[in-house]
Regions:
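Bacterial N-terminal signal peptides that target proteins for export
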Residues: 2-11
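Short linear motifs embedded in intrinsically disordered, proline/glycine-rich low-complexity segments
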Residues: 11, 23-262
Length: 262
């Protein structure tokens, strides 16, 4: 179980970039980058839903993750009425990240939109990349029944955890048969938090694919109750995942649902 990391700070403003800005000029490395992007986009649109025109980007991650961001996808290919919140670019050919931001300052307007961001960039020791993995080797999904802001707060927390704090979620999930995280802040209130179980995607969800630069797996974060959190500590994350999959909850997040243990 990961406790809430107080070193992770949230920047509340997001900005959007048109998808066309993701394209690059065509030298050898950039051709590979674009081929990975195109293959991943095709997989998402075949198995989840059409990607929006705009990608959400956290200002402090601009330079660290220039070709990545977060998508809010109407998940019609999974089930109408569902929304998939997803990282998009952890499996890019220029990942893992080799720099980290420090002394970030972001200015917002009255509507909470970003006006400007300044940061100092420092090189960091790169993560040893597996030859079989595409970038970090995974993308993170949260599936919900609503188009809301709180899942984006969670996605930003995930971005900070992976890109800045260098936490290898995939390795932890594989080592522990899943990963529970408690009290992740997803709103302005002190008690506006969620607990999640992070596990590999289970069928009938798409599990992953082989991209031109290696394997991509999907990790899915599912909101769980306090009771389920404590039960998983005693009985195992894999046991909780099985109970979720055997129930109507599966890997879909609903902050208002009752515990499956009742």
């Amino acid at each position: 179980m990961i406790k809430k990391n107080k070193l992770i700070k949230f920047l509340l403003g997001f900005t959007t970039l048109a998808s066309s800005t993701m394209s690059m000029s065509k030298n050898t490395e950039e051709i590979e980058w674009q081929s990975v992007y195109n293959a991943r986009q095709a997989f998402y649109e075949t198995n989840i839903g059409k990607l929006p025109d705009d990608i959400m980007k956290a200002p402090h991650l601009f330079a660290v993750w220039p070709g990545g961001g977060f998508y809010v996808i109407p998940a019609d290919k999974i089930k109408k009425g569902l929304w998939v919140y997803s990282t998009f670019g952890l499996t890019n050919s220029d990942m893992p990240a080799t720099i980290t931001p420090t002394n970030t300052e972001t200015e917002y307007n009255q509507q909470g939109r970003v006006i400007s961001t300044t940061t100092t960039l420092q090189k960091k020791k790169p993560i040893i990349q597996s030859s079989t993995k595409a970038g970090y080797g995974y993308e993170v999904l949260l599936i919900a029944k609503e188009d809301a802001e709180w899942p984006l707060r969670f996605m930003q927390w995930v971005g900070n955890l992976i890109l800045i704090n260098d936490v290898d979620l995939l390795s932890r999930v594989e080592k522990n048969n899943g990963l529970t995280v408690e009290a992740i802040p997803v709103g302005d209130g002190e008690n506006d938090t969620i607990n999640v179980l992070i596990a590999k995607a289970q069928k009938p969800l798409p599990i992953g694919m082989k991209l031109p630069n290696g394997n991509m797996q999907f990790l899915v974060a599912t909101v769980i109750t306090d009771e389920e959190m404590q039960w998983s500590i005693a009985n195992g994350r894999d046991a909780l995942l099985k109970k979720l999959m055997d129930s109507n909850t599966t890997q879909i997040s609903d902050r208002d649902r009752q515990s499956i243990l009742k």
